[in-house]
Design a protein with these regions (language model features):
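Long, structured stretches of catalytic cores involved in phosphate-ester chemistry, encompassing
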Residues: 1-191
Length: 191
């Protein structure tokens, strides 16, 4: 209905992505002690997470009318300094994503992501976007990680047992309210 339009965008973040850059053997030992992964940011200007056709499609989608936009990514969008697969490994494309959201005046963007085998919520205030961006990470039902990985943008979590995410929208409020929660296998709210 008008005023309650939800747009769901599913990104393919592997098809056109450049290979991840691994750290040196010496760096691995230091990172392992911090529960970090073995990847680092790729600052090559040609390094990309999405291809040009994908960027064009995404811009057209963000220009469509919507009251809330859920952008799903197989890897975390806002997490930083983890050393694992994430958009921060491609800082140029991550910056481009934030700027595209601002340029298209896409309101109500919420990222939903997976991959690290635990749940957490991350948040960033970026000058390109007139509102804070949130990333709800939830995974997985059969593979999980109890270790606490670093993330400079984490505001809630992590929860490292089997889980799933729930998004509820209260359209009756003067401005829609989005409720995020992480549930365990019994359905109990844990985050």
């Amino acid at each position: 209905p008008l005023g309650q339009r939800v747009q769901i965008i599913l990104l393919d973040v592997r098809y056109d992505r450049n290979p991840l850059v691994k750290v040196t053997r010496e760096e691995r030992a230091v990172r392992k002690a911090r529960n970090m992964g073995y990847y680092r940011a790729n600052h090559d200007p040609a390094a990309r997470m999405l291809g040009e056709d994908q960027w064009g499609w995404l811009e057209r989608e963000l220009r469509k009318p919507a009251d809330l936009r859920l952008i799903a990514s197989g890897t975390r969008v806002l997490a930083e300094e983890t050393g694992h697969e994430e958009w921060a490994n491609f800082p140029r494309d991550r910056r481009r994503l934030f700027e595209l959201i601002g340029k298209t005046a896409a309101n109500g963007v919420l990222f939903v992501s997976g991959d690290p085998h635990f749940s957490e919520y991350s948040k960033i205030a970026d000058a390109s976007v007139p509102y804070p961006l949130w990333d709800m990470t939830s995974s997985a039902l059969n593979q999980y990680n109890r270790g606490k990985r670093p993330n400079a943008r984490r505001v809630v979590g992590p929860f490292g047992e089997p889980n799933f995410g729930v998004i509820e929208i209260d359209w009756n409020a003067p401005k829609p309210i989005v409720h995020l929660s992480t549930r365990n296998l019994k359905g109990a709210t844990v985050l």
